[in-house]
């Protein structure tokens, strides 16, 4: 269900940007509000899904003491998504391509992964470190200086 809302959010994000360009309307406040909505849809939503999975995952015995607080590590994704969106708003180089992983791609990755492989990811205790590394890697990809393909349409 959460994945469907992320997909719906991605569709609305695409169409609101396209309609603003077609109607030639933009404002600084609109740009910031769009980024805020994007952070909720593509940052907080996937982080909440990851949080829920981290709460029920099998933990290795060495990390069992971390069970009460470790699920909150999921919100690193939301923080890095907000940072990525802030960088995007200020970076003039991202007119034809993206620099760093776009937040919708990251959200769709996490939503798809946790929707389709939830049992596989939560049951073996050795998967917890894998998921934590994936959180770090995807967060880094959001803000790294790596050029990425973009589906951007010119007016």
Predicted regions and their residues:
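Interhelical loop and helix-boundary elements at the membrane-water interface
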Residues: 20-39, 83-105, 144-155
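Alpha-helical transmembrane segments of multi-pass membrane proteins
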Residues: 6-13, 76-87, 114, 134-145
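Alpha-helical transmembrane segments and their lipid-water interface positions
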Residues: 16-20, 41-48
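Helix-coil boundary and interhelical linker segments in multi-pass alpha-helical membrane proteins
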Residues: 1-4, 47-72, 113-130
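Membrane-embedded alpha-helical segments that form the functional core of polytopic membrane enzymes
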Residues: 1-32, 69-78, 134
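Functional transmembrane alpha-helices
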Residues: 1, 37-43
């Amino acid at each position: 269900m959460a994945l469907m809302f992320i997909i719906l959010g991605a569709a609305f994000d695409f169409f609101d940007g396209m309609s603003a360009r077609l109607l030639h309307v933009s404002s600084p406040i609109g740009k910031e509000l769009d980024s805020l909505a994007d952070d909720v849809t593509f940052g907080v939503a996937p982080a909440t899904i990851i949080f829920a999975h981290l709460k029920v995952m099998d933990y290795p015995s060495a990390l069992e003491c971390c069970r009460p607080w470790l699920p909150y590590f999921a919100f690193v994704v939301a923080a890095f998504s907000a940072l990525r969106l802030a960088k995007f708003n200020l970076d003039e180089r991202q007119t034809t391509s993206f620099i760093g992983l776009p937040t919708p791609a990251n959200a769709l990755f996490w939503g798809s992964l946790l929707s389709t492989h939830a049992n596989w990811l939560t049951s073996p205790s050795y998967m917890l470190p894998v998921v934590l590394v994936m959180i770090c890697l995807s967060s880094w990809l959001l803000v790294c200086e790596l050029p990425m393909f973009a589906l951007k349409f010119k007016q």
